[in-house]
């Protein structure tokens, strides 16, 4: 078994403080790209919490998971959305309901768990799809009927119905990562940070919570190797702190604050390259409709009308990001030009008076990041202008990502929350998190709408672009009507890297660690 330096809690419910790295990050010995180009050091905005592909928590974990548990396919680095095979020798859609695959021969699991087989593929996919397992990502395989094993290396994925996002948001994500059936069953059917039976281009060889994660090339991987012998991942929550670390020479690559892009592009640090990429992500103010103080839709609609979205976005991002109008980014079916509510403080005051909500007090939970705090302060001022007192509560990432979970004890006390979700290049990957099944999982607004669910399911099988556009616009209109959402921005993605590094990035700027190479 791979030895991991792993001190401290492993479940996300007790990781209050994971990733709270701050300026202390740079007290570590410098491990940025070595003179011989063997070690790459990058920043992650949160520490890892769960390595199980079926129960992963955040985007940074995705990159680690697909590096250590070989997926069937992965996205291709570059400016076009496409994919390439990793664990499979071949994979093709035979018809609307059938996908045939054959694994590469000789992919082994560590710790004596033997060769990867089609039986492991069947187990890995079906455990995500099985409702009994309550995977947050069951929607990725909602159309699955079964995986049929043909022989040791080949099989068929059978679908119950056509599933349009399969090649965009299911197969090229950790939803196609293959774990060892034997190993996972021995661990009780799921795992958190255990690194048993790894199989990918890299192995996770060291994890010091809140400090670093080390990936090392898998010596038994016989196919395309990762670009660096080692990748050191430092969890640094605040992008401004990461930018200082980059300028100090402690990092080879980091995402930047969106608000820093104008400054960095105008005056980049010596030996660096500054990147700006279009973003699929979305940022919004969520309102918990089951909270006792916010159950009246008139109060929630008042909050919508109280928020000056343009001022919030301009203040938080220094003019570097545009106002967004939903959860679906420009360029995708369902992208909207406007929301169905507007900034109207007088209307907000009238709705509050009608609801008898004089002297309303609310809390606003945010991640402890400078951009989030600036946005929250503008929201706080907007609410004060209509007579609502708002207390801002800052959280580190380990705490923040548990706030709305039904497994915790805070979800009914949650009132307002400023959130950002990453995205895949299909609108269904935005809408899925707000279905009734996601209430208390990722649907922290506790928005429960049967029409919304029916439209989401319709969008998964509809291939006509115009009809999909109508469906996803209608879904976002229902979110507007609930009063539980104030959509703010899709941001842009800013990054900076040393000119000695050729980063592997998706078209939206998200990293593909195994595709980073020396320049």
PLM regions and their residue ranges:
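Surface-exposed binding/hinge segments that line
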Residues: 92, 137-183, 206
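Alpha-helical secondary-structure segments
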Residues: 41, 117-124, 152-158, 200-201, ...
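N-terminal secretory signal peptides
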Residues: 1-10, 20
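Aromatic- and charge-enriched surface segment that lines or borders ligand/interaction sites
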Residues: 90-134, 156, 242-245, 293
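Detector for C-terminal structural segments
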Residues: 21-22, 40, 208-212, 217, ...
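N-terminal lobe/hinge region of extracytoplasmic solute-binding protein
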Residues: 43-95, 126, 195-199
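Ligand-site clamp/hinge motif
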Residues: 218-264, 389
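A structural "hinge/loop" feature
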Residues: 46-62, 84-87, 113-114, 166-175, ...
